[in-house]
Amino acid sequence: MNEQTAAALRRAQARLDSLDLYPRPVSLRRVRIWHVRWLFRLPWFRRFAGYTMWPLILLREPLHETSDDLVCHELCHVWQMQHHPLRMPLSYLYRGYSANPYEVEARAAVDATRR
């Protein structure tokens, strides 16, 4: 992992560590950030700037063009999956996106920790 990625994850981790959402703090072990612009050209992904799949954070734009708020939001999803590895991703099948409690929680985590 390069230093820019490590620094972005540490900043997001520090923000989330100030919250008491889950019994264990978010772990950065195995977390990776990939810039995959082509993925966000696919119809399902066009509306997103970032997407998380377990310890993998996928970004539309390069990390140096991505806000700390987005990295924090996506790392919150990593944290959620560390505690609910099946329930969290499956919730999108029956709750959808915007009203999904995990999305609401990730947006609230960003708002609560915004400087």
Annotated model-derived regions:
Residues 1-5, 9-18, 24, 72, ...:
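Anionic, Ser/Thr-rich low-complexity intrinsically disordered regions
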Residues 1-52, 56, 107, 112-115:
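Auxiliary, metal-adjacent structural segments of Zn-dependent hydrolase domains
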Residues 40-46, 53, 65, 69, ...:
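Post-HEXXH active-site segment of zinc metalloproteases
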Residues 56-76:
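Polar-ligand-bearing catalytic/cofactor-coordination segments
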